[in-house]
Amino acid sequence: MNVEPMYLTIFLIAGGIIFLVLFFHYVPFFLWLSAKVSGVNISLVQLFLMRIRNVPPYIIVPGMIEAHKAGLSNITRDELEAHYLAGGHVERVVHALVSASKANIELPFQMATAIDLAGRDVFEAVQMSVNPKVIDTPPVTAVAKDGIQLIAKARVTVRANIRQLVGGAGEDTILARVGEGIVSSIGSSENHKSVLENPDSISKLVLRKGLDAGTAFEILSIDIADIDIGKNIGAALQIDQANADKNIAQAKAEERRAMAVATEQEMKAKAEEARANVIQAEAEVPKAMAEAFRSGNLGIMDYYKMKNIQADTSMRENIAKPIGGATSKPLSD
């Protein structure tokens, strides 16, 4: 039995299998066949070179087929490969271009890739251009001129502005500007009743301010969904001011009382000092009388006259006192 032809046959079969595996790995034949059937002009060599460049054909070729079927013949394989190698999402870009074409929205390929590379979902942006998005704002608190606090909630309908998606502000900026406009509108109202009666006045005033300037969206409408009455901020501020004024008045009154007490104590000290001076002066009287007797300037009759005057003065003082007071001293001889 000849064994060599059998080994040769096995070797050829194994080699053929390995060749077919490598061929279908590096050259996606069925993908090429699908592209040919769809009318996309691409060769097996180009598919093989995609593998060499680490570009997956199963991403590029379906995108080319979708674009060709949608009538977007200006999209080339090289552009899709370049966008993939730049880190973009080929599927999103192709879907967005097809949707924009069907909706008659002008969206060049370069703009779509720029939006995608900027980190935004270009397909979602196109969908928002066709179907506007409704954004609910968080509760916005504002105070009218009469001091009543109002809590408002709004619904903002926006549409994506494709030309502003690169470099334009996002939803957070829209919400912040709308909240600022609501606060300004309520704050300029004379009273809270006028706001409750005409909530659409807030929407009209906010829309006139052009809050979507420099953003990636176009504001279509602003609707006030709900308005609640909060605290009476004006009354609370008046109460706080009254309490502050009361505390200030009490502090000033306490200061005046302390000054009055200090003045009273000072006057008492001065009175005690005056009494001490009087007592000291009275202590000098007997000495002066003795000196007058010795010098002959004061006679005995003058002395008795002085004593009588003192007795009369004491009697008058006792008469002027209430009943129960001390009796007058007897006249001295």
Swiss-Prot record:
GO terms for cellular component: membrane raft; plasma membrane. Belongs to the flotillin-like FloA family. Pfam families: FloA. It comes from Bacteroides fragilis (strain ATCC 25285 / DSM 2151 / CCUG 4856 / JCM 11019 / LMG 10263 / NCTC 9343 / Onslow / VPI 2553 / EN-2). InterPro entries: FloA. Found in functional membrane microdomains (FMM) that may be equivalent to eukaryotic membrane rafts. FMMs are highly dynamic and increase in number as cells age. Flotillins are thought to be important factors in membrane fluidity. The chain crosses the membrane at residues 10-30. It comes from the Bacteria. Keywords: Cell membrane, Membrane, Transmembrane, Transmembrane helix. This is Flotillin-like protein FloA. The keyword Transmembrane applies.
